[in-house]
Amino acid sequence: MVYLSTAQQVFQIQYDLKDQFPYIFAGIAISIGTATFLNGTLVIKFGMENMVTYSLISFFSLSLIYCVLFFGTANPSIAILLTFLGLQFFSIGFLFGNLRALAMQPIGHIAGIGAAITGFISTIMAVPISTFIGRFVFGTALPLFFGFLVCSALSIAILIYLKSAKKRIKNTVEISN
């Protein structure tokens, strides 16, 4: 969501690409669409949980690389920025569907209500986070990637916690049987 609120400023003001902005926006959206399309095949091969793990690690790594390379410098060339954003959003394309499907697993019997609840929660969380990060995006796109970095690090920490909790529960059930 932070990208949606800052993309126009980054491309039109920071890079002076007012006329090209719709094409740039569409190009990055294609990376999400491509990942979503590929996800149908890859999730069968690797599983939802692995796809989430790999995608989060990719998202985190790309953010970290961008932040290290461009900390304290001016914006990189538009080609470099678009490459990083395209790869970031390619990772997001895998995350969206798989995270929603994983969230729906325990409440599949009430899928309609479950989808509404998970959509509501993700939006309620995304708005203040994107508003906060978006306030720092001026003159450079670096705060956008720092926001990606922090949010993906927190997501990985939550994922590790949930995997360990799932493992503990599984071990407890096996011991009691």
Which functions belong to the PLM regions below?
Residues 100-140, 147-148:
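A late C-terminal transmembrane helix in Major Facilitator Superfamily
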Residues 1-25, 32:
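Extracytoplasmic gate region of multi-pass secondary transporters
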Residues 26, 30, 86, 116-124:
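Transmembrane alpha-helical cores of Major Facilitator Superfamily
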Residues 162-177:
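Intrinsic disorder in cytosolic terminal tails and internal cytosolic loops
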Residues 29-37, 127:
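Residue-level signature of mid-helix packing/kink "hotspots" within the transmembrane helices
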Residues 145-160:
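Symmetry-related core transmembrane helices of the 12-TM Major Facilitator Superfamily/SLC fold
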Residues 35-51:
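Helix-to-loop junctions at the C-terminal end of transmembrane segments
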Residues 50-99:
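C-terminal transmembrane helical hairpin of 12-TM major facilitator-type secondary transporters
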